[in-house]
């Protein structure tokens, strides 16, 4: 081993490479044959007679296990029935269960559902009628009668409306004039309407004429209300003026 440990270092003082370590490991295995005892005392040791003993499981709770074994030897433990079997109605069931079933059926047949009663209020013809302890069956009968009566009244009302409508339509047809002659009469009576395009052209002319009339009236008013008369001044300006000193010469 001393030679092997000494060879682990090179002469130069450097660490060996991976290939060198592998070669040295193979050389060591060839010399020694194995790595030694690596089982750490966990291998099965053979008995004195030469046979190997099978490994046994470690008992973590030895006290409880021994108590369970002793109680199991003394008494047989019976499992509890959490869901007991119900009595079936098959032929294998006992006669007692059949009798019980028949008794239950008879009692259910004999017992009738009690009719529930409550106060009933009816609004009819502008009146209010209140009945105490009115059974549900009678209330249903009253509702059925009301539905039948409402259906009959509705059919009668619709028939009357249809008859009145037909009679009114016949009267209108009889009172109305001949529909063929009416368009000719209306066309003759109605005046001929002018073309809207011609009206649009005539409107500016009428406005222009009315504007001229308005301006003429305003012109007359302006001339009459002026502080001096325009016509007189024009005549005076047209006549020559002869001063007195010119006439003396």
UniProtKB/Swiss-Prot annotation:
Gene: TIFY10B
Binding partners and assembly: Homo- and heterodimer. Interacts with COI1, MYC2, MYC3, MYC4, AFPH2/NINJA, TIFY10A/JAZ1, TIFY6B/JAZ3, TIFY11A/JAZ5, TIFY11B/JAZ6, TIFY5A/JAZ8, TIFY7/JAZ9, TIFY9/JAZ10, TIFY3A/JAZ11 and TIFY3B/JAZ12. Interacts with RHD6 and RSL1.
Domain Tify: 113-148
Name the UniProt record assigns to this protein: Protein TIFY 10B
Keyword Acetylation part of the UniProt annotation: yes
Keyword Nucleus: yes
PROSITE patterns: TIFY
Organism annotation: Arabidopsis thaliana
Residue interval(s) of motif Nuclear localization signal: 206-213
């Amino acid at each position: 081993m001393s030679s092997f440990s000494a060879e682990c270092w090179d002469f130069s003082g450097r660490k060996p490479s991976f290939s060198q370590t592998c070669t040295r490991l193979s050389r060591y295995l060839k010399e020694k044959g194995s790595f030694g005892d690596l089982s750490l005392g966990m291998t099965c040791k053979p008995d004195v007679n030469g046979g190997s003993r099978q490994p046994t499981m470690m008992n973590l709770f030895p006290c409880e296990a021994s108590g369970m074994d002793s109680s199991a030897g003394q008494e047989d433990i019976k499992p509890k029935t959490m869901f007991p079997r119900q009595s079936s109605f098959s032929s294998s069931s006992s006669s007692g269960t059949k009798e019980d079933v028949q008794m239950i059926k008879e009692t259910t047949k004999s017992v009738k559902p009690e009719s529930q009663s409550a106060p009933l209020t009816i609004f009819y013809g502008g009146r209010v009628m209140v009945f105490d302890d009115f059974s549900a069956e009678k209330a249903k009968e009253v509702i059925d009668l009301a539905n039948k009566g409402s259906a009959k009244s509705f059919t009668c009302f619709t028939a009357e409306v249809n008859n009145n409508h037909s009679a009114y339509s016949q009267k209108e047809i009889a009172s109305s004039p001949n529909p063929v002659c009416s368009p000719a009469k209306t066309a003759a009576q109605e005046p001929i309407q002018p073309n809207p395009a011609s009206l649009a052209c005539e409107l500016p002319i009428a406005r222009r004429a009315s504007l001229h009339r308005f301006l003429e009236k305003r012109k007359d008013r302006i001339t009459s209300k002026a502080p001096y008369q325009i016509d007189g001044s024009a005549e005076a300006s047209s006549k020559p003026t002869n001063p007195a000193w010119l006439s003396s010469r």
